[in-house]
Every structure is written in C-alpha cells, then in structure tokens.
Amino acid sequence: KGLERVSFPAEVISIIPSPSEPKRLILIRARGPLVEKIGGIAAGMSGSPFFINGRLVGAIGYGWDFSDHNLGLVTPIEEMSKAWDWQAKKGIEGGKVKFHESKNAPLIVSGISSRGAEKISRDFKGEVEVLPFDLPVGGIGVDYDAELQPGDSVGVLLAWGDVSVGSTGTLTAVDVEGNFLAYAHPFLNRGDVSFPLTRSWVHEVIPSIKSPFKLGSPVSIVGVVRQDRPQAIAGKIGHFP
C-alpha cells in the first residue's frame, strides 16, 4: 500500500513462444503469504521486476482472467528493451493473436459522471477496462527531482485537473540518466506518444474473481512516456510532456 515496495517469490515453469510481440514469455507461479492475501498477481503489478539470482530477467506483464491468478507471464527484459528501438510511428500494432490478458490496472476515471465514464469506455472500444471511481481530483504537482526505483508504483495520465483519467502499473528499470521501462506490456499501444508519467499511491489491492487489481491514484508527475509499444512503455524521468 501507499508508496511501499514489496517482494514475493515465484518459480519459473516454462518458456512460451508468443505469436505476436513480445516473441517470448516466461510462465511463472507466484507464491507466498502476500500473494495468497491479495488473491494472486494483481492487475497493476505489470512491470514488477522479476529477478533470478539477483539478475533482472524481465517483468510481470500478463495473466489470465477468471483463472489461477497465481500464474503469470513475464516479458523478458531484452524484449522490453525493444521499446527503445521502434521508429517514431504512431499506432503500431503488436499482433492480432492473444492467448493472455495484460495485467493492466483499470483506467480510473474521476471527476465525471458514470454516464461520462461509459462514453469513455465506448470510445476505447474494449481496449482497456474503464472504472469510474470517486477519487479526489484537482491539480497534480510536478516533482522535478523525483528519484524512483524498480518496483515503485507509477501511472500514465490521459487527463488531469478537474477530471482525472489514468492507469497504474509498476516501474521495471531506470538508468542513471532517468531512462525507464515499465508495464511489460503496452498501455494503449499508440506508438510514439507524450503522456505524463506519475508516481502512484496504492490505496488497496481489490480482490476480484476476474482478476485482483491495484487501486491507485497519481501523487505527482515525475516524467514523460515517449514509447507505448507491444513490449513495454518507455520514457524519461525528469523530462516532461
């Protein structure tokens, strides 16, 4: 909860070839009392770094709805790094075949009516789950000197101010210059973008038969998302849209 980072053990089960980007995924089973308490791998944990013997191997990106939520798919870090290699073209598609669901937290919409949220949901045509929630809205400050670490909760904003629209995920890796990778799957798969990156406060992990999810809200704008690609989102902390 809050800004706390926590860890949990997981075992590798298999390596699975994927029919679309990313081309390989690592099947894991999460274990431990924390995972049992929250009901498995939650949406919004996407981007959570996965280490083997202290080495960053990748990040949790996918799972299955209405299934065993302890099972998940890790996007290898070499696949995630491809987010930096795409040419600046918008709307690049990663492939049509899906055998899993991204662990993307719902798009939280605050400051508008349920009817307005339903319209936003229709506009996205099922690309992302839209959840209206009466969280406090208003001005979100900018943290020009934010220091984030792998495992921190982060978010992407589409709107902020009197109306807030955004999602919550997890930071996977960041270098000394502030270049980062997160989510381990696309946000909206829009290609070359300029979305605010936020530090997120996690209120609670909400249990669900479909898939548990992290309920978070933005604390401050800390950087910019420049790439929204099939393997990950990427951008720079300390730079802004």
Give the positions of each predicted feature.
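Terminal presequence/propeptide segments associated with secretion/organelle targeting
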Residues: 1-241
